[in-house]
Amino acid sequence: DDLEQAVDNSAATAEVVTQERQVLHNILDLGEISVEEVMRPRSTWVTLPLPIHLDDLDPQSIDTGFVVVGGDGEIVESIIPLDHRASLPARHLERLAEEVIPVPWCARLAPVLQRMRDTFSSAACVVNEYGEAVGILTHDDILDTILSPEPSRARRLLRREPVEEVREGRFEVQALTTLRYLSRRLDLDFEPDPEDQVTVSGLLQEQLERVPVVGDECQWQGHRIRVIEASGRGPVKVLIAHED
């Protein structure tokens, strides 16, 4: 019995060591990953005008975990966290609003996390070169990037696995998936270029130079990517297969 217990403890210890190494690896990656890869894109959150009451919250805002306090739409100045909904008042939720810090889309996660800690901010507004809000990054988003064995923004937003193998060597992929995560799933030796697109959708748009529609294709890292589902804004889902 003692020997079996020792073996079990050894296996458990090895698993813990593996997890710790992965966390350390993820922490080191914070210096390389841009906020654009982790942020929640503009179309994924809800903005509500003042005043904001509990009855105004819809399922999307609850799933997102926060609601943006209404403004001019070009910049996000504050959000209302919804992590503890049971303790929220019925009226005037805007009184609980927290200011967000602005950060450029090209910033790396490590300095942004440090700035959030220094300013006691729970979220950052990601802005493009014109000062327009293109995304929101929360403290929880960064924690997920650190603690998850395979960090994925698409999985976090969609609440399902964004890359599914439908047949051997053929994958259905959500277009929101980052190329960094996709390369890990496909076991590719790929390091994202800070100057290039970060998602499957962005890759398609860059290569085609237009909004992709169903049937459009492009090539990437020895694979062919074909759009199998799209909306008016662009691709939603693609099929990826290795080129023979």
Q: Where are the model-predicted features located?
A:
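Soluble cytosolic regulatory domains appended to membrane proteins
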Residues: 1-244
